[in-house]
Amino acid sequence: RHANDVLENGIVIYDSTLENIKVSDVITFDNDFKERMEGFLKSNNKENTIKGIVELASERGASIHSVSFRSLLTELSEKLDNPRIKNMSRMFNVLGVSLSLGLLMIPSEKLTESVNSIFSKKKSIAEMNVSAANFAYNYATAKFDNIGLKFEEKEIEENTLLVQGYYGTSIGKIIAGCRFQS
């Protein structure tokens, strides 16, 4: 969805098993976006697939990193001798975030803390997700070229509120006196 927003020197990590999916078959793309993207790909002589979108990002100077998320889960399931893990596609988000942190060389401790916090009442689920996170993080640090970016850790100041975009918008509207949002 955000391929056109990736800047030069940007980074794309994507699931290689999705390369041949047509834009029209991506269920998370709304119809207007599909039409725009299909036209954009056609005007740039690219395939009407995820592969075409990734090629455009690459041509604009983005660093492209392809990995099969399913293969990562399969390798992890073999390593942990837990065949159930290889079919847990809901772990793809954890894999994606962990691959990103590994590529950017951002310490993974905060991710581990977050996963343990989110699944604090489900210890076995937390352990599986932490294993997946560490596995993907280590994969990225071993397999992806160092991109040369350095991030410094910042302390979160007291009274700092971290919210997702739609929460921030809602809070802003309430503070501004808006009484109805549709």
Where are these regions (language model features)?
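Active-site cofactor/cluster-binding pocket
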Residues: 1-180
